[in-house]
A protein has these predicted regions:
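N-terminal regulatory modules in eukaryotic regulatory proteins
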Residues: 1-84
Length: 84
């Protein structure tokens, strides 16, 4: 699972580098970018039923801060934190 989280973190960091640290990053945008960078990526390979489940695990491990968008039901990435 940590390998998948690392891929997500790298993708988020690349998006922040490209769009700026204040950019609003949606979970779906992160997944699309990750699939472009690694076309073979599939969260189920790492044991996650959905990409949101992967994001939730990253947050549970203290590596991401998420916010649920009430209108869309999707996640917005608030920040990437350094693994402890």
């Amino acid at each position: 699972a940590q390998e998948a989280i690392d891929l997500v973190r790298e993708t988020i960091e690349a998006l922040y580098a490209e769009k700026g640290d204040t950019a609003k990053l949606w979970g779906s945008m992160v997944k699309q970018t990750l699939k472009r960078r690694q076309p073979s990526f599939n969260e189920s390979f790492y044991g996650f039923a959905s990409f949101n489940e992967l994001l939730e695990e990253a947050q549970a491990r203290g590596q991401l801060e998420l916010e649920m968008d009430k209108r869309s039901g999707g996640y917005v990435i608030r920040s990437v934190t350094q693994p402890s």
